[in-house]
């Protein structure tokens, strides 16, 4: 039986990597460290998936450039202090390896910067299993479709043969903007209620169920 999809594009944080708690703490702490108003962790977690510049604007509006730069530097320092300790969700590595072996093209589209993604791939040992990756250092932040558009062009896959997997509304809106089908996961940054307004073909509460679905494609 022929596959429904040729290309599977993964978000990273909150989809493959169990990193949402650490990211939230890093931005909450950074805001306090540079003298900005305290952040509610739930509010802070809702920006996961955006690029850092866009996240700062959503959280604090049009603050002075020097304050935004100080926050970005402090967040980056906080994040990299614990980055090497961030695990993948249980079963994620095996799922990626199996999908690769079965002939799927695999890619990453993330709000992380290039340095952060490269370090994450190095730490988890999965870099060789992805055919291409895109970050906010090369593309517009989600939900702009540029990451998906460039991945499909680079890997020569049509939108109807591409599947996006993510844990935020930014992932699902990006997929819609690129005319790509999507799967939502609720074990990451955003809840089922937050994600249910998008036309995902499936929604899963734990990685194990997502893996079962993907391995049945």
State what each model feature region is.
Residues 48-80, 90-93, 97-100:
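A metal-dependent, Asp-based hydrolase signature
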């Amino acid at each position: 039986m022929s596959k429904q999809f040729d290309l599977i594009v993964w978000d990273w944080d909150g989809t493959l990597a169990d990193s949402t708690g650490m990211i939230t703490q890093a931005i909450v702490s950074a805001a306090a460290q540079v003298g900005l108003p305290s952040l509610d962790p739930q509010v802070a977690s809702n920006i996961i998936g955006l690029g850092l510049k866009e996240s700062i604007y959503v959280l604090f509006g049009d603050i002075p450039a020097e304050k935004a730069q100080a926050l970005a530097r402090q967040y980056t320092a906080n994040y990299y202090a614990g980055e090497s300790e961030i695990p993948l969700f249980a079963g994620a590595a095996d799922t990626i390896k199996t999908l690769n072996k079965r002939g799927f093209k695999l890619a990453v589209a993330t709000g992380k910067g290039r340095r952060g993604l490269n370090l994450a791939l190095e730490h988890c040992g999965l870099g060789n299993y992805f055919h291409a990756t895109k970050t906010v250092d090369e593309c517009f932040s989600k939900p702009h479709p540029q990451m998906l558009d460039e991945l499909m062009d680079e890997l020569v896959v049509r939108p109807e043969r591409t599947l996006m997997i993510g844990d935020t509304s930014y992932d699902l809106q990006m997929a819609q903007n690129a005319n790509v089908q999507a799967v939502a996961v609720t074990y990451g940054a955003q809840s089922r209620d937050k994600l249910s307004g998008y036309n995902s073909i499936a929604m899963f509460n734990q990685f194990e169920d997502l893996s079962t679905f993907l391995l049945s494609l």
